[in-house]
Amino acid sequence: MVISVPATSANLGPGFDTLGLALKLHNTFSITPSKLSSIHISGEGEDRPKLRIDNVFIKIFNEILALHNYPMQPFKFSFHNAIPISRGLGSSSAVIVGAIVGAYHIMQKPINKSEILQLALSYENHPDNITPALYGGFNVSMLDSSLKTKEQVINVQALLPTDIKAVVVIPNVAISTKFSRRSLPKKYSTKDAVFNLSHACMLSAAFITHKWELLRVASQDRFHQELRMKNIPALFNVQKIALENGALLSTLSGSGSSFLNICYCDDSGNLAHILQKHFPKFRVIELEFDNIGATLIES
């Protein structure tokens, strides 16, 4: 059995902990019943012994099986990681979603994405990456605690069309979300809060109605982006050059260090070429959007 989960880009500027989308860059997780337990990792992180010794996927997978009183047994795990680790592209969300979906398939339990989403929230308490990893497309997510004893995720998904594409710039610097959040203030002014609220609403409307001309102005942010970009000052130039060369939107991806640029498909090759020329030490990749999310690709 093989599960595929896409990379994700969250925040998208003003949508802090709320907005996210899925990209066609996937981690695959193979799970096979076996006489002996084993783990093999290829791709990103394959040279990190910690990923084998203390593997988060296996930990969550086993916890979900135990939650449903499923008898424990040995498995052969084989993971291929295409999503860069600690680069703001949802590698941790892919692991969480993949582990839960994988456990459901092993138990032959019907895939209830709403139920899986709530389980995933117990491992990552902000849903902006979790929802697109699970559902695909563009997602608006919120946490609601008004009627429940614990917070519930509510999300709305919109499919992304094929006339736009992502050009992602990936610096050779890892930044953890926990570290990145330390640079953020505890309080914001009413003026900045209204600014972000209005821009996040307009950005959501632009994605849902496909009014791409609004992306540039609607993706401005006053909560987190510039503060986080100061950790890697070159990102200010990435954004400037991208917007001067066809990008409709240019924002920090999640907490960084990657930068998400969205452009028309006809402009993606030129934009990628220019960015790679200016930033030869960074990876620059063109990606389509993923509208499927986590899926079983081999039973």
Curated annotation (Swiss-Prot):
GO cellular component: cytoplasm
Origin: domain of life: Bacteria
Pfam families registered for this protein in UniProt: GHMP_kinases_C, GHMP_kinases_N
SUPFAM superfamilies recorded: GHMP Kinase, C-terminal domain, Ribosomal protein S5 domain 2-like
Keyword Nucleus: no
GO molecular function, one term: ATP binding
Subcellular location(s) of the protein: Cytoplasm
EC number(s) given by UniProt: 2.7.1.39
Transmembrane feature ranges: none
Broad enzyme group: transferase
Function summary: Catalyzes the ATP-dependent phosphorylation of L-homoserine to L-homoserine phosphate.
Xref: HAMAP family: Homoser_kinase
Protein's name according to its UniProt entry: Homoserine kinase
